């Protein structure tokens, strides 16, 4: 297994990125991006392993302890981390593709579910041979990580990333708002109708300056968790064959072994499904009756402050929210979390992230050593000392991580996978950027009018998704 990359592969990968940019898959124009050169990437121009993450300089600095620990183990490998500021994952992937097109890609990229198949299809190098070679070293990792997270990074039978962190769309609730409405903690198996009744009770107790349910218009935590709970999605979900080498090698005795595959596929639109209409109609009713907001596009930057000031009753989010609520002044008993409400199923949605080795990496063997080290408990405890996300390792989701910060029922986070093993990743094919645009474009219209408008919006979404899925990734 060599780390060398020949010029032919480098040119193919560069052409791939240029094609993706030219096709508009990212939804922006090259002219609007800052010019990038080799000097923009730490490590480019020397033998350092260059690693790109989404974030700020402070995020890069936060990884220094992990880099120091890695250097002690591998003094022959120099590592430099570049944090790339971006509005969201789509923006981050845009900037990575720009670097590839400029001929100055990083060696390793931290990629979330939203971009996993885009990278696997064209940009990333599979990990199969490395994982097989170092199976003895990797066994402890897989024993500590739920197979659903691993399967999210399988693509056409090969593994492209190891999950480092993840978050499910659970339901956060403000305990003060619940108490004011005379509500107890919801049951683990509460339904979408129970949820609506809870919202109505909070609205009655707080008729003004209060939102019972706040949600955003994006792939994670928007309409998709409701679609999953209703046993559907806006894209038809199928699975690739393959992957037996991984599942039989590391998860042979796992109770969910029979569910595993060579990876998810989303090849066709499904916005015209009756259950998609039913799910949107439910959300339309919440908006119409003043129980929920019209969804805000993006991540909802004002959400933490509103929730912390007791102006929001419930919202879908994952373990990444805990530290932010703590820093906003919420006590450990001021909020709690519960499983997402049950409908026809109680399948949840999650997103995960991990490092991908670029096909153009200068030294793939060195890149693998970084990924292997980063998957260790030592490294993950250095990178995730606070509940800014949910660690992929089950053993790290423990009382110590949430002590003094909450929530009281923190076990919900990992129990989401253990109790609902069909819980699945964000629907993100290689054309994810265009697909997300097609979804977001039609959501607000679908939930803000009458039934006729809803049907028109879903018909528009179906057409937009058909076009999006035809695009070359």
Report residues per predicted region.
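Hinge/lid segment of periplasmic solute-binding proteins
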Residues: 113-168, 334-338, 404-405
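Short helix-initiation/N-cap motifs at beta->coil->alpha
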Residues: 84-95, 190-194, 294-308
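Glycine-centered hinge/linker elements that transmit conformational signals in sensory
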Residues: 199-200, 238-296, 340
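N-terminal export signals
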Residues: 10, 16-36
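Long, aromatic- and glycine/proline-rich binding clefts that accommodate carbohydrate-like moieties
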Residues: 331-338, 385-441, 445
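Extracytoplasmic/periplasmic substrate-recognition and gating elements
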Residues: 72-73, 78-80, 181, 264, ...
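Conserved C-terminal helix/tail region of periplasmic/extracytoplasmic solute-binding proteins
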Residues: 2-3, 7-10, 18, 43, ...
